[in-house]
Structures are given as structure tokens and as C-alpha cells.
């Protein structure tokens, strides 16, 4: 509570602190998005390769 009171007393400091938090959150979200995108592509490739293996086995 004391930190919040200190930050709201100085508006410029509060805005800077808020901007830093938004920037940090956006970096985390971007990293998560990239990892999820890679995981989805790898899952698709695994499904296609397993389907191809089944087709090759049946021939």
C-alpha cells in the first residue's frame, strides 16, 4: 500500500512504472505466442508424418 501511495503522489513516476510493467508483460506475451506457434507447427508436422507412416505401412 505504501508503494502505491508513493507512486500516485508522483504522477510521472507512476506513469513510468506502469509503462515498464506493460512493456515487460508484452515481452512475456510475445515470447509465449512464438513458443505456442512453434508448438502448433510441430504438432501439425507430427500428425502429418504419423499419417504418412500409416499410409506407407498399409501399402
From Swiss-Prot:
GO terms for cellular component: plasma membrane. Keywords: Antiviral defense, Cell membrane, Membrane, Nucleotide-binding, Transmembrane, Transmembrane helix. The keyword Transmembrane applies. One of its GO terms (molecular function) is nucleotide binding. The keyword Nucleotide-binding applies. The chain crosses the membrane at residues 36-56. InterPro entries: PycTM. It is a single-pass membrane protein. It holds the Pfam family PycTM. One of its GO terms (biological process) is defense response to virus. It is found in: Cell membrane. Pycsar (pyrimidine cyclase system for antiphage resistance) provides immunity against bacteriophage. The pyrimidine cyclase (PycC) synthesizes cyclic nucleotides in response to infection; these serve as specific second messenger signals. The signals activate the adjacent effector, leading to bacterial cell death and abortive phage infection. A clade D Pycsar system. This is Pycsar effector protein MePycTM. It comes from Micromonospora echinofusca. The lineage of its organism: Bacteria, Bacillati, Actinomycetota, Actinomycetes, Micromonosporales.
Amino acid at each position: 500500500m505504501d508503494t502505491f501511495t508513493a507512486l500516485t503522489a508522483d504522477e510521472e513516476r507512476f506513469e513510468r512504472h506502469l509503462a515498464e510493467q506493460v512493456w515487460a508483460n508484452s515481452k512475456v506475451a510475445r515470447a509465449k505466442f512464438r513458443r505456442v506457434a512453434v508448438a502448433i507447427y510441430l504438432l501439425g508436422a507430427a500428425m502429418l508424418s504419423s499419417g504418412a507412416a500409416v499410409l506407407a505401412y498399409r501399402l
